[in-house]
Amino acid sequence: MKKTGYFLLAVVIVAAVAGIGYWKLAANPNALRDIVLQQCVPNQLQQQNPAPCAEVKPDAGYVVFKDRNGPLQYLLMPTYRINGTESPLLVEPYTPNFFWLAWQARSFMSQKYGKDIPDSAISLAINSRSGRTQNHFHIHISCLRPDVRAQLDDNLAKVSTRWLPLPGGLRGNEYLARRVTESELAQRSPFMMLAEEVPDAREHMGSYALAVVRQSDDSFVLLATQRNLLAFNLASAEEIQDHQCEILQ
């Protein structure tokens, strides 16, 4: 009976997730890609005007776009087709280090806010294939939830230079955490670190969500959560962010 019960529960969960996925796809999952490829890039190349993006860097291969959700949230996106964390391009050495580029783009938040925002209040996040609403690669540049900030501060000494479970997880979900220096983050993509250092991750990159947060000792913590349908975890690292930016109040 127990096995049957677990099987039925799994079926219900999978059906529910499929329903969520269908609902997401109904809202044009290519909207961001259309904005980047049909508006931002052509406008920059033809008129030297990045609108509706805030910035377009064709040679570097990325754009920065003001998201409509929240007063300070921005997105960093490639100028070419990459769907998301499942893309094999992200573990190729010639692919731009999008997380490092996104960290540089945090200055747009301060410009919008009208004064400098402390690095400790900023986070970067990308959702997994099951945890996203859009099928064009995008890193969320936004404020960090105050409770997540407090939890990361409490666990500062427990974060290793190896991928290890973060004590207590975050937002009710299990996370792996890894400490990196600013130099390491600048030189090596977090996607590469995850794929090369976590067993079996390379074959299942699309099931992972990733986040980057600055720590009080000036290091960075990389955070990764993997889809787990039985635990109701769709792997949406955006859950650690607060697009209303309570942390600044």
Swiss-Prot record:
EC code: 3.6.1.26
Pfam families, per the entry: CDH
Catalytic activity field: a CDP-1,2-diacyl-sn-glycerol + H2O = a 1,2-diacyl-sn-glycero-3-phosphate + CMP + 2 H(+)
InterPro entries for the chain: CDP-diacylglyc_Pase (IPR003763), CDP-diacylglyc_Pase_proteobac (IPR015993), HIT-like_sf (IPR036265)
UniProt subcellular location: Cell inner membrane
Membrane topology: Single-pass membrane protein
Gene Ontology CC terms: plasma membrane
Keyword terms: Cell inner membrane, Cell membrane, Hydrolase, Lipid biosynthesis, Lipid metabolism, Membrane, Phospholipid biosynthesis, Phospholipid metabolism, Transmembrane, Transmembrane helix
GO MF assignments: CDP-diacylglycerol diphosphatase activity
Membrane spanning stretches: 7-27
First-listed, main subcellular location of the protein, grouped into a coarse class: membrane
Family to which this protein belongs: Belongs to the Cdh family.
Name of this chain's protein: CDP-diacylglycerol pyrophosphatase
Source organism (scientific name): Citrobacter koseri (strain ATCC BAA-895 / CDC 4225-83 / SGSC4696)
